[in-house]
A protein has these predicted regions:
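N-terminal export signals
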Residues: 1-20
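Structured, non-membrane catalytic/scaffold regions adjacent to prosthetic-group chemistry
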Residues: 20-202
């Protein structure tokens, strides 16, 4: 009886959550709480830098993270010609939409940092990342004052036929000095397993 009652209560709770999630008032409360969370986080952490390490502390192996071989026709064609035809496309709420090649990105001011990657899967590794600060590229595109977030579309597929993986970050994180569009890991061009041709490091 206890199990059945608990199951029924859980069903009611979930049903209530579903109704709440469709309520404009409840959505407003959640949005306010989300905004407050961001403000408190920024107040406590600010623009603090992540710890940087020495070359002697580099991990001997830097595992693949995510899809280690995006096996799509488009990606394979780009990989076969060394990503010469690949472009970083920037659009949306910007004054200047951009299509930047790897050569153009490499011509921008570079930053190198030795930082630790802490994966949600429970492993970590220290790597030397080189690339262009994301803020530098965003400044070229001139985001609109209305822009608050950026959405990044990746070569990784979520699941067969489900489309590409994407992620988003706010502009505060995008402009953090250590947020990097990395094209090299440990002084070598990014390998496919590490996100070639370009990986965002936040």
């Amino acid at each position: 009886m206890l199990l059945r009652s608990g199951t029924a209560f859980g069903g009611l709770l979930l049903g209530g959550c579903d109704r709440l999630s469709r309520s404009p008032t409840f959505e407003g409360i959640l949005a306010s709480a989300d905004s407050l969370t961001y403000r408190v986080q920024r107040l406590l952490v600010g623009n603090a830098l992540a710890r940087e390490f020495t070359p002697a502390e580099l991990s001997p192996v830097f595992r693949s993270n995510g899809t280690d071989d995006p096996d799509t026709d488009e990606y394979n064609a780009l990989r076969e010609n060394g990503f010469v035809d690949w472009r970083l496309m920037i659009g949306g709420l910007v004054a200047r939409p951009l299509a930047l090649s790897l050569a153009q990105l490499r011509a921008l001011p570079q930053r190198t940092q030795i930082t630790r990657h802490d994966c949600v899967e429970g492993w970590s590794a220290i790597g030397k990342w080189s690339g262009v600060p994301l803020g530098t590229v965003l400044d070229l595109a001139q985001p609109s004052p209305a822009a608050r977030f950026i959405v990044l579309y990746c070569a990784d597929e979520l699941e067969e036929g489900d489309g590409g993986y994407y992620e988003s970050i706010d502009l505060i994180d995008a402009y953090h000095p250590q947020t990097l569009l990395a094209y090299a890991l440990n002084d070598k061009p990014l390998a496919v397993g590490n996100g070639a041709p370009l990986r965002l490091r936040v």
